[in-house]
Amino acid sequence: MTEISSMVISHKKAKVEEMESAWHGDLDGLLRNLYKHEYVYECVVLKTCNRVEIYVVSPKSSSVLFSFAKEMGASTHIIDFYGHDESLEHLLRLAGGLESMIVGEDQILGQIKDLYAYSKKAGTTGKILETAFEKAIQVGKRIRNETRINKGSVSIGSAAVDLAEDIFGGLTGKNVLVIGAGEIGVLVAKALAEKDIEAIYIANRTYKKAEEIAYELGGHAVRLDDIRDYLPGADVVISGTGAPHYILTREIVEEAIKCRERKLLLIDIANPRDIEESVVELENVELCNIDNLRVISERTLRMRKEEAKKAEAIIQEEIRLLNLQYKRQKADRLISELYKQVYDVRLRERQKAVNRLSSYHTIGDIETEVLDDLTRSIVNKILGEPTKVLRQAAELGNEEFLDVVSRVFCLDKEKVRFEKIKQAKFDQIKPGCTKEQAEVKEEYAVKD
């Protein structure tokens, strides 16, 4: 049976710059590059500021994933390669927030939904990955409903605000500039709105979106081109855009601090980074990035240890159900192919009988219907008991028995079946993307 395999590059092993360099194309390019491979039958890509993950269904998963890792130029010491069972457990843990830098954060579940939907619209998913991802999304919701794992600092955005509070000893009376009004920027702004700060300024490439968020949270909208005018008055700048270049260069920051003596804290939560690293050499400027949020992550992990145990128990329960679902799917596929094979014989033999009878006398609709009902009933009665046995064998995990049945009846010609499905989908994939895909691409942009 062809199963799921995955390769994962995440904050656990990779530094910010290593994740940045993991892939330089767009999501369309990466998906098409994966899917055109002869031995990739299904694929999904998850790309966020903290991870690049590739899930494939392939009979030669190891060689396929190693070749993609080589193509991406990623060092194997920062990559985790997972087989089927490990991939399923990792995906469910990811959706539940257990693999996040901030354990229990909610943002990752939305990202999985969006990026899975993107791959599905692109036509690169099939029954195997769809089953896994739909289960993961369901489990992510269940964990958040049945535990308190998402209470407290539950996102990169709120962790950035907590980090700023730690550094300043509180944000009372501070002016904060948020650059970027995507999902992370909104989370930052919402976390800031709960603090006793002097003012929130929200800058974005699309000014209308900045206005909407500023209006909702009682802040001030800023055009992205005007941020130079607001930097001198800011105490904290938190930047998380999808830009392919630096938003704040050393030159811009140096100009902003000329006429001030107080500290300027810059927190860069973008991938690729928004702020040029050399700003740390400037006096009264402190730069933090995603790596610094590990401090907050460790603190949150201690707070949520008991809730994480409950989440782990849910995941193990759901893994068992998911594996049972896959076993049933295999049995159902064999049963479907067996019925199709026998029904093809039924139709041929029924037609032969009709032709023979027609040679003696005229056959009416009633006679044809009787022959049709008779042959169908015979097939269903003969296959009824084997169908039950196949389903029971699948639920008991008797793979050997299923394989024997498959070989005896020449069923489940997997490679041919997958290739036909894949070709039909690939023929439908057109250049460009839908409006919904374009929105996902902008939110999880992978820069050139």
Curated annotation (Swiss-Prot):
Keyword Calcium belongs to the record: no
Protein function: Catalyzes the NADPH-dependent reduction of glutamyl-tRNA(Glu) to glutamate 1-semialdehyde (GSA).
Record family assignment: Belongs to the glutamyl-tRNA reductase family.
Pfam families in the cross-refs: GlutR_dimer, GlutR_N, Shikimate_DH
InterPro entries reported for this sequence: 4pyrrol_synth_GluRdtase (IPR000343), 4pyrrol_synth_GluRdtase_dimer (IPR015896), 4pyrrol_synth_GluRdtase_N (IPR015895), GluRdtase_CS (IPR018214), GluRdtase_dimer_dom_sf (IPR036453), GluRdtase_N_sf (IPR036343), NAD(P)-bd_dom_sf (IPR036291), Shikm_DH/Glu-tRNA_Rdtase (IPR006151)
Annotated site, Important for activity, chain positions: H90
Protein's name according to its UniProt entry: Glutamyl-tRNA reductase
Its EC number(s): 1.2.1.70
Binding-site residues for NADP(+), renumbered to this chain: G180, A181, G182, E183, I184, G185
PANTHER family: GLUTAMYL-TRNA REDUCTASE (PTHR43013:SF1)
Active site: C49 (nucleophile)
Residues the record lists as binding substrate: T48, C49, N50, R51, S100, E105, D106, Q107, Q111
Protein keywords: NADP, Oxidoreductase, Porphyrin biosynthesis
CDD domains hit by this protein: NAD_bind_Glutamyl_tRNA_reduct
Domain comment in the entry: Possesses an unusual extended V-shaped dimeric structure with each monomer consisting of three distinct domains arranged along a curved 'spinal' alpha-helix. The N-terminal catalytic domain specifically recognizes the glutamate moiety of the substrate. The second domain is the NADPH-binding domain, and the third C-terminal domain is responsible for dimerization.
Leading EC class: oxidoreductase
Gene Ontology MF, one: NADP binding
Assembly description: Homodimer.
Pathway(s) served: Porphyrin-containing compound metabolism; protoporphyrin-IX biosynthesis; 5-aminolevulinate from L-glutamyl-tRNA(Glu): step 1/2
Gene Ontology biological process terms in this record: protoporphyrinogen IX biosynthetic process from glutamate
Additional remarks: During catalysis, the active site Cys acts as a nucleophile attacking the alpha-carbonyl group of tRNA-bound glutamate with the formation of a thioester intermediate between enzyme and glutamate, and the concomitant release of tRNA(Glu). The thioester intermediate is finally reduced by direct hydride transfer from NADPH, to form the product GSA.
Domain of life the protein comes from: Archaea
